From Swiss-Prot:
Name assigned to this protein: UPF0212 protein MK0748
Classification via NCBIfam families: PRK03922.1
UniProt source species: Methanopyrus kandleri (strain AV19 / DSM 6324 / JCM 9639 / NBRC 100938)
Recorded superkingdom: Archaea
Record lineage: Archaea, Methanobacteriati, Methanobacteriota, Methanomada group, Methanopyri
Family: Belongs to the UPF0212 family.
Amino acid sequence: MGEETGGDYHVVLEAAWIVYNVDDEDDAINIAIAEAGKRLNRHGLDYVDIDVGFYECPECGNEIEGVWIVAGTALVRLILSMRVFNAESEEHAIRIAKYEIGQALEDVPLGVVEVTPL
């Protein structure tokens, strides 16, 4: 029997990032990306790509930025993507990505957006 090697995957996660004391969407997005980047870099995860997520408006079909501000507090949908190598399956790749990113971002909720084989 030959030794099996795992597969390589591109895993895209979404994070629900809260930003306090902001007045507009651009500030909320910039602060969220900067704070997430600092935490990821502190854990040596500078290879994780960070972007703001978009949603499709149910009324008009246009894309809108994933940021909502209420009472000076913003919820920003961040998109975090990374490559996972030698994973046993897509599910294993997701667990690896969530573990690595989750350790750096601590209490930030993460969800799976997409997993594609490389």
